[in-house]
């Protein structure tokens, strides 16, 4: 029978339609023939059988319709075998058949396959794949070093198919097995039901072989299996088919976990994390590739088994070394930032290079671009932490354990020495970037309960912060992962041991972790920002001076300025990402609410409305670390300096901050640390609207804050709290308290000025003054009286110091202009320059502060008079005002005429105006005017005449000049009368004179301890500042003083006699 006849017979067979092609049917017949031949060889020859008939059947290859039909029914499995062969070829792209492609049909077989030659030789005549040899075939395929060299065409198509070549010749075996897995999945959806188990088995073979590859990667030459796994995931993320890869990985992971005899699961997977660590550490914040790798890690932190390996992998070699955490995979991620990698080294820094050559708009665009990446970056870190916290109790404990240990190991970042020794600091502790990013992620975790009315917020249990050291098992049971918090100073001393619960909730842990992270990170960076800002200002001034003098140092100074500006812009950008700031503000406002609720004794989960007077129950504050309040203040001050728009857009939440400031600023019972309470005054100054801001032509930049501040319902309590802390910081017990108090009071002056301009606050201040006027003789001097006394003390000291420094500057400037410094050695000249610069800084500080104190006295005296004209305050304020006028308008003013007043914030015109305003405010009181001439040290009629001349010169209003002239005349008349009286009483005996002031006593009193008699006004004034007997330092209060009635009568009799004698002489 000819081939054509055979083909015709087969094609007319109705069963031939079950085959994919005519060639498949012929192949089936060939296989069947081979099997029949094998069966005939195995059976013994029978004499009854006809050898000729069998031989003819085999040799003639008779493809008659009847014979094929009978064979198909008898050997149906042969058809199934063909289909299995084709399916295996389609899935694994391998074959044992290298026959002419023209004899194969293109239907159901891939166009290109890897020919497994060695296996084909081993199997001799079998050129098909089945379920018994497929595993061997896959293994053989995986061992091929270059499968592309073994590709053959399976079809007769002459068209070049690069995709088929690439798929079949895939060299990377992990990627190859994944592709096989995908093709097997596809087959499962297409094959008929009888082939389905075989398709599933092929799918399982891809998984089991992948498991083998991962367990024994050393078998496969030139194959980095773990690199391939990472690259496969990376490609999937970038190609949006990541779910397909993770489905494959899930099954591989499950297979690996079933048998860990060869290698444990962590041993298999740790190389993957090694690769990720190596790649991520070289990436920058603004590189897109970084976020693909983070997505890989996000999957790992969602997958329970990989998450456990990840937590094991990120454990540092030395848990007590804070810097070691930065070297872990999570630490490397947290260290990515726009901050400088090596502090001070701007070379190779990718951000804000040569800022002076960039326009403000270009810098703003770069900043916005970085912020976009930062927001995405922080979201990824947050999701990783959230995944681990939610995945299982084991992973939750693991990540909290890591965070707690990390913070404890880095606790030294806040030490003073750490900032002074950077070379040691960066060997011991993780970086600023690390803590800034960690803080941003933890802030996101806190947002669900960072709402002022959140019931979850009040479930925070402060006793968490005072638990003593626990072992690891106890930490796990109690959910306490922070270490060392019990060594932190709390808001108030503990009176009794707290009752500790069995365990703590996640809100408590999250708040404690986040607040401490901010304390270690954001807080420190803020300090650095302030210093950088100051250094920039100094460099700018020095650079400008060098340019003006054509100094060769100008170029060097410009380079320094450029470098520092790069550091400044990088740091500012890192700290001002809008979403991070908003999240932090939400947390700090919530912390203000929480602390207020603890301060009024609320131990429930629902907030209690604030009311005054405050209740007594506040013992829980003894378990709250001071850094909780310090963070709150520090952040709001930061916003005022570097991101004030957020304060305005979030103004409604600031009322909660005002509640916090009102309660804690004035309450030593609730916040013992006077330094921290003084800082709250700076916080108040930060959040209040500022008078000196230029409003936008379209909308006021302080409108909302002004509304909140003016409508604050507890204005009287806030005013009193501010004045109380002003007084309290006079005596902090700190060895540097004298210098500190001026810095602490600096922000209080603008607050007082703003309060005075608002009706509710001004009336509250006047009420305090009225109370003081009525209780001058109280055992404890009234608050406002002590405040005024300290205010005048400050004014006297500050302006006097400013005058001294200006005089020294004037002398040094004259010496320099005369060329006297040119003859000095370079070192001596540098010392002179440094001295002049130091005097300038000191003069500027004292001038600023004295301007504020005199200005405050100026507006207070406009409506508060009775206290100022009282004898024991009047004398002091008059002597102060006259002394300053003497330097500002008298002959001594020449000594203060430095080159540039503005450089030192010296404002003599404003000072003269304020002093005259005080005089005019109090000049209506006859007693006050009568006291002015008693100032024998500075007062003279000439002084006031000189003052009038200066008022005219500085163009003050005419009505003010006239009023002051009239006041001067009245005082001169009183001075003349007093001079006559003094001449009359000049020979008073020592017994009648005050031992401190050497003036005639009008109200002699006896001090109980020393038994010394002094004038009542003198001792009253002394006790405002120092509640001790001035003669023996024994404790003393006004109620202990007794009038010396007998001496008073003697003085009055003597005065009457002297007066009578004078009248008789006249």
Swiss-Prot record:
Pfam families: U-box, Ufd2P_core. Residues 987-1061 form the U-box domain. The modification N6-acetyllysine is found at residue 386. PROSITE patterns: U_BOX. It comes from the Eukaryota. Ubiquitin-protein ligase that probably functions as an E3 ligase in conjunction with specific E1 and E2 ligases. May also function as an E4 ligase mediating the assembly of polyubiquitin chains on substrates ubiquitinated by another E3 ubiquitin ligase. Mediates 'Lys-48'-linked polyubiquitination of substrates. This is Ubiquitin conjugation factor E4 A. The lineage of its organism: Eukaryota, Metazoa, Chordata, Craniata, Vertebrata. The gene is Ube4a.
């Amino acid at each position: 029978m000819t081939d054509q006849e055979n083909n015709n017979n087969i094609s007319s067979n109705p069963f031939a339609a079950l085959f994919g092609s005519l060639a498949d049917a012929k192949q089936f017949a060939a296989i069947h023939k081979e099997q029949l031949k094998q069966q005939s060889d195995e059976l013994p020859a029978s004499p009854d059988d006809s050898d000729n008939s069998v031989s003819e059947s085999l040799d003639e290859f008779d493809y008659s319709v009847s014979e094929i039909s009978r064979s198909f029914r008898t050997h149906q499995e042969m058809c199934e075998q063909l289909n299995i062969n084709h399916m295996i070829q389609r899935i694994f792209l391998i074959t044992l058949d290298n026959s002419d492609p023209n004899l194969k049909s293109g239907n159901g077989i891939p166009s290109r396959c890897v020919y497994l030659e060695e296996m084909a030789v081993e199997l001799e005549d079998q050129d098909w794949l089945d379920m018994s040899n497929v595993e061997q075939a896959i293994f053989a395929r995986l061992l091929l070093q270059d499968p592309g060299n073994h590709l053959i065409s399976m079809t007769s198509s002459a068209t070049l198919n690069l995709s088929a070549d690439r798929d079949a010749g895939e060299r990377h075996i992990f990627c190859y097995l994944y592709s096989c897995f995908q093709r097997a999945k596809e087959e499962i959806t297409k094959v008929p039901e009888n082939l389905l188990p075989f398709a599933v088995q092929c799918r399982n073979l891809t998984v089991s072989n992948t498991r083998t590859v991962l367990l024994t990667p050393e078998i496969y030459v030139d194959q980095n299996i773990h690199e391939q796994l990472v690259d496969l995931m990376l490609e999937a993320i970038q190609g949006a088919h990541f779910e397909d890869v993770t489905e494959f990985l899930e099954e591989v992971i499950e297979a690996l976990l079933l048998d860990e005899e060869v290698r444990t699961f962590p041993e298999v997977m740790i190389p993957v994390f090694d690769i990720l660590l190596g790649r991520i550490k070289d990436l920058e914040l603004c590189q897109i590739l970084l976020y693909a790798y983070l997505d890989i890690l996000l999957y790992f932190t969602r997958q329970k088994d990989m998450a456990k390996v990840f937590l094991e992998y990120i454990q540092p070699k030395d848990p007590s070394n804070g810097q070691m955490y930065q070297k872990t995979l999570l630490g490397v991620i947290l260290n990515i930032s726009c901050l400088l990698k090596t502090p001070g080294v701007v070379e190779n820094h990718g951000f804000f290079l040569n800022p002076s050559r960039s326009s403000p708009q270009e810098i703003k665009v770069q900043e916005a671009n970085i912020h976009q990446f930062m927001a995405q970056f922080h979201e990824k870190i947050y999701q990783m932490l959230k995944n681990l916290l939610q995945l299982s109790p084991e992973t939750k404990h693991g990540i909290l354990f890591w965070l707690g240990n990390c913070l404890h190991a880095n606790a030294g970042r806040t030490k003073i020495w750490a900032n002074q020794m950077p070379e040691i600091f960066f060997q011991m502790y993780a970086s600023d970037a690390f803590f800034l990013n960690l803080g941003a992620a933890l802030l996101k975790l806190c947002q669900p309960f960072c709402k002022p009315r959140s019931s979850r917020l009040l479930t925070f249990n402060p006793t968490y912060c005072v638990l003593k050291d626990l072992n690891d098992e106890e930490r796990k049971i109690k959910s306490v992962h922070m270490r060392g918090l019990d060594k932190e100073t709390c808001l108030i001393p503990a009176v009794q041991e707290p009752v500790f619960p069995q365990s703590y909730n996640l809100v408590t842990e999250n708040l404690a972790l986040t607040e401490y992270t901010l304390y270690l990170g954001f807080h420190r960076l803020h300090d650095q920002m302030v210093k950088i800002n100051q250094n920039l200002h100094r460099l700018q001034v020095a650079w400008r001076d060098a340019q003006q003098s054509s100094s060769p140092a100008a170029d060097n100074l410009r380079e320094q300025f450029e470098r520092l500006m790069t550091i400044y812009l990088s740091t500012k950008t890192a700290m001002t990402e809008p979403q991070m700031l908003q999240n932090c503000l939400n947390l700090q406002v919530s912390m203000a609410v929480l602390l207020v609720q603890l301060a009024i004794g609320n131990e429930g989960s629902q907030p209690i409305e604030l009311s005054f007077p405050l209740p007594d129950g506040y013992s829980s504050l003894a378990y709250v670390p001071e850094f909780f309040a310090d963070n709150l203040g520090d952040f709001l001050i930061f916003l005022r300096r570097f991101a004030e728009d957020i304060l305005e857009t979030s103004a409604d939440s600031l009322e909660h901050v005002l509640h916090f400031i009102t309660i804690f600023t004035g309450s030593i019972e609730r916040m013992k640390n006077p330094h921290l309470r003084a800082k709250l005054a700076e916080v108040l100054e930060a959040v209040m609207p500022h008078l000196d801001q230029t409003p936008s032509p379209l909308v006021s930049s302080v409108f909302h804050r002004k509304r909140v501040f003016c409508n604050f319902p507890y204005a009287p309590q806030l005013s009193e709290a501010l004045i109380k802390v002003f007084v309290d910081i006079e005596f902090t017990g700190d060895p540097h308290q004298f210098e500190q108090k001026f810095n602490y009071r600096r922000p209080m002056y603008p607050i007082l000025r703003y309060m005075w301009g608002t009706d509710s606050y001004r009336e509250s201040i006047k009420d305090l003054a009225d109370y003081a006027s009525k209780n001058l003789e109280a055992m404890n001097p009234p608050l406002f009286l002590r405040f005024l006394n300290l205010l005048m003390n400050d004014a006297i000291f500050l302006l006097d110091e400013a005058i001294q420094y200006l005089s020294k500057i004037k002398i040094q400037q004259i010496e320099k202009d005369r060329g006297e410094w040119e003859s000095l050695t370079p070192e001596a000249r540098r010392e002179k320059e440094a001295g002049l610069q130091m005097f300038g800084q000191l003069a500027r500080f004292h001038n600023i502060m004295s301007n504020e104190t005199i200005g405050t006295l100026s507006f207070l005296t406009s409506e508060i008079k009775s206290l100022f004209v009282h004898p024991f305050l009047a004398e002091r304020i008059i002597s102060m005002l006259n002394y300053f006028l003497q330097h500002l308008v008298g002959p001594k003013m020449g000594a203060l005429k430095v080159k540039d007043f503005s450089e030192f914030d010296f404002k003599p015109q404003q000072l003269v105006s304020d002093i005259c305003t005080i005089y005019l405010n109090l000049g209506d009181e006859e007693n006050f005017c009568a006291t002015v001439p008693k100032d024998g040290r500075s007062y003279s009629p000439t002084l006031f005449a000189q003052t009038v001349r200066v008022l005219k010169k500085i163009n003050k209003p005419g009505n003010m000049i006239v009023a002051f002239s009239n006041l001067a005349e009245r005082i001169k008349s009183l001075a003349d009368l007093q001079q006559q009286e003094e001449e009359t009483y000049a020979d008073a005996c020592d017994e009648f004179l005050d031992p401190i002031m050497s003036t005639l006593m009008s109200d002699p009193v006896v001090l109980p301890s020393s038994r010394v008699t002094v004038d009542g006004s003198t001792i009253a004034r002394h006790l405002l500042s120092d509640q001790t007997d001035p003669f023996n330092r024994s404790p003393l209060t006004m109620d202990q003083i007794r009038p010396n009635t007998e001496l008073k009568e003697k003085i009055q009799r003597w005065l009457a006699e002297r007066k009578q004698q004078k009248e008789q002489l006249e």
